[in-house]
Amino acid sequence: MSDIKKVVLAYSGGLDTSVIVRWLQDTYNCEVVTFTADIGQGEEVEPARAKAEALGVKEIYIEDLREEFVRDYVFPMFRANTIYEGEYLLGTSIARPLIAKRLIDIANETGADAISHGATGKGNDQVRFELGAYALKPGVKVIAPWREWDLNSREKLLKYCEERNIPVEMKKGKSPYSMDANLLHISYEGINLEDPWAEAEEDMWRWSVSPEAAPDKPTYVELTYRKGDIVAVDGQEMKPHVVLETLNKLAGENGIGRLDIVENRYVGMKSRGCYETPGGTIMLRAHRAIESITLDREVAHLKDSLMPRYAEVIYNGYWWSPEREALQALIDQTQNYVNGTVRLKLYKGNVDVVGRKSDDSLFDEKIATFEEDQGAYDQKDAEGFIKLNALRLRIAAGKGRKL
């Protein structure tokens, strides 16, 4: 263990990572550099500085990454209309590549020979952090304390703090759930949620009112798109992270974005989790709406066929992989004409698309109309089209093939 001289730790300032700081110092006799990222988790990150200083940390990195997170990770993901297993908007998964990147950047800047994280040995995050780290710095050493130590309960962690005089802040009103938050979503796991039959308690949800308690009057919002990304809300241009903050507020007020699922983790187990992704729920509906009038049919269908694979790549932690980059290049190319405006109605947990328009629209009213089209579409042409497409079916039926 003496070959480890300096470690960069993904540090939240909470119980687990505060214990990890001291554990790394004691176990590896190394210097610890802490890195705390503000990706919109809704908590002050600056107090992490004082906590790290109290633990003897000399190099402390605290960074506001909200704009980079939404611009370079969330928006590219939403260009693909990405959902995992038909429901999950990948709020936790998409935050890990940026954190892994900054851990490696800081390791390079400080001359550290290892990185460390507080992900457990049961979850997906250990995979996501470490796959990203190895892709960006192949020879880096990764220390995952939860896979090494025997501090496998909150009681043992608190006892460790008491024995070593590590200050622990016990917040009043702190949720008993295991939670993870960023600008895209907040997740809840543990306690009664470990029973897939138990309904989540109403006071668990932090970002949204219940649909029943949402206003009786709908809220309308218009989103402007440029090359597949939202650039304005109700005509007001905004930076990407401000767009998401704005949509989170609007959606949360209208009871939008709650999800309760059992998902298949990459490590092999099934896990029940509850998620609030208010702004992301709006973004998914709106993006599909603007694509519906601007994308060629076959391009849209190709994108839809690739989306589950793209979602799986991100969920499993392969953001920094050649397959993700190849898929991203194709997805981004499809967005060149995804420009225009979508109007949505938000009402008691529902997001309804009520209008869409674009200068790049492929919707031709003269052809699509049920009224007189002045010869724009000759209905007689349909007969040959149908006969050609039925040819294989007619041949098979003529040979006596049974379906």
From Swiss-Prot:
Enzyme kind, highest EC tier: ligase
Residues the record lists as binding ATP: 10-18, 37, 118
Binding of L-aspartate, residues: 120, 124-125
Gene Ontology CC entries for this record: cytoplasm
UniProt entry tagged with the keyword Membrane: no
Keywords: Amino-acid biosynthesis, Arginine biosynthesis, ATP-binding, Cytoplasm, Ligase, Nucleotide-binding
Location relative to the cell: Cytoplasm
Pathway assignment: Amino-acid biosynthesis; L-arginine biosynthesis; L-arginine from L-ornithine and carbamoyl phosphate: step 2/3
GO biological process: argininosuccinate metabolic process; L-arginine biosynthetic process; urea cycle
Pfam families assigned: Arginosuc_syn_C (PF20979), Arginosuc_synth (PF00764)
Quaternary structure, from the entry: Homotetramer.
Protein family per UniProt: Belongs to the argininosuccinate synthase family. Type 1 subfamily.
Protein's name in the database: Argininosuccinate synthase
Organism in which the protein naturally occurs: Marinobacter nauticus (strain ATCC 700491 / DSM 11845 / VT8) (Marinobacter aquaeolei)
Gene, per the UniProt record: argG
